[in-house]
Amino acid sequence: RRLGTDRIDLYQAHRPGFSVPQDETLRALDDLVRQGKVLYIGTTTFPAWKLIEGLAVSEKLGLHRYVSEQPPYNILERRVENETLPLAAAQGLAVIPWSPIAGGLLSGKYPVDGSSPKGSRGDAGRQIWKARISPSGRVAAAKIAAYAESRGWIPAEFAFAWVKDRPGVRRRSPVPGPRSTWNSPCRPSGKA
């Protein structure tokens, strides 16, 4: 009711609960689908083994199954190519990548010198962003930005286009997630 809608099209379980059995989670999600409150269920940031476990539990118990996975995926973070993307293809799961511009790192706003724009994730000091916006990440991002710019692309736009054109990713599915227009792959140039 608070969302102002009768139903949710896709309800995603965010990160697996390792202390909660899959059957418990899936029964709760299945109840929502059967009640008409949710059309489809999916996951976000699940390791491939937890996804396949969930699919097996759904099949065994006759429950609605996950239809999608939303992993972090970008030109610098490609771990999902080893297991998640092949699993998704084999099981007919949609892949909805998040962080296609790597938390802003691929937007071109984080120089190699280690400085961060005021108010940015890199400036916030949270440990997760310190690990992602690392010196080696900045160097790699600068090389990617130079490559993109040499071909007339805005760096964020290039990074977004790279993700959406990957095998196994539905073309309109990556979630940009920019915090500002600086990061947005939707800035005008029309290539993404």
Annotate each language-model stretch with its function.
Residues 58-62, 85-87, 112-116, 189-191:
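Short, hinge-like loop/turn segments at secondary-structure boundaries
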Residues 33, 100, 124, 130-191:
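Conserved short secondary-structure transition element at the edge of the structured enzyme core
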Residues 39, 94, 170-173:
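Beta-sheet entry/capping signal
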Residues 87-147:
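Glycine-rich, positively charged active-site loop/lid region within alpha/beta enzyme cores that binds
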